[in-house]
Amino acid sequence: MVIKRGFIGNTPKPSRCKRTKPIFREPNSPVNGGLVYNHPLHTAAAVKEAFSENRGFRTCHVCHRKNNMRLKVGTCESCKKHTCAICIRQCHKCESNVCSMCSKQERTFESEAFCPSCYPLDTY
């Protein structure tokens, strides 16, 4: 009888990666019992977002850059979200910090940009 390496009896031994790999099942499966491995709350992005406020790694909501020594993340006055120094700008009239997403709603008049609170929307 020849003993082959990596075999148990006549069947091949399962590889290590197949044994440790989680089994993906449907969430409503009776076999699963409510445990879901690929749930959106368990993804790396969700975990990173959950711990970003506590550890000081705030990300810009426009470009999603991290806060580091070179790039400071502030708060937009209009939408109250974290915005990096590249995506934030100042209103010429009131000197408030407005992000580039909110600045799309701005109106320009005589080559000066105003934030929505400074410039009335009904006048063109």
Curated annotation (Swiss-Prot):
The keyword Nucleus applies. Keywords: Cytoplasm, Nucleus. It comes from the Eukaryota. InterPro entries: Siva. Its main location: cytoplasm. The keyword Nucleus applies. GO terms for cellular component: cytosol; nucleus. It holds the Pfam family Siva. This is Uncharacterized protein C26H8.13c. It comes from Schizosaccharomyces pombe (strain 972 / ATCC 24843).
